[in-house]
């Protein structure tokens, strides 16, 4: 699959795909004999992984570290596990904070909706 096709499939720019590869967020992509990127299923798996992890807010550095560990072989499985466990905990912490914020917004929305109906704003 060409970089253009991958770009269209995942709605991500070609420049971003090149950047991800250049900084190590995805391993080097398979290339044709003339040096053109030729994304294979394994390459697409890495692209999907990066898109998912970035959309979850994982730091670029953590994604790069994970890719590096994967490339070093099975002896890094414990380190990969630890990295993923830490990132999962970070995501759970973020979700908890977002839930607190959501509750506060719900409360304020409720107060303002009541104020629109009654003509009076109350924080009781």
Task: Identify the role of each PLM range.
Residues 68, 72-124:
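C-terminal regulatory/oligomerization modules of transcriptional regulators
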């Amino acid at each position: 699959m060409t970089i253009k096709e991958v770009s269209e499939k995942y709605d991500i720019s070609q420049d971003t795909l090149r950047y991800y590869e250049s900084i190590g967020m995805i391993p080097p992509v398979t290339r044709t004999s003339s040096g053109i990127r030729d994304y294979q299923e394994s390459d697409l798996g890495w692209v999907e992984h990066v898109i998912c992890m970035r959309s979850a807010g994982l730091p670029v550095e953590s994604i790069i570290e994970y890719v590096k560990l994967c490339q070093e072989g099975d002896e890094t499985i414990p380190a990969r596990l630890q990295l993923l466990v830490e990132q999962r905990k970070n995501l759970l912490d973020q979700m908890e904070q977002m839930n607190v914020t959501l509750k506060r917004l719900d409360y304020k929305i409720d107060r303002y909706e009541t104020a629109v109906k009654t003509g009076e704003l109350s924080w009781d």
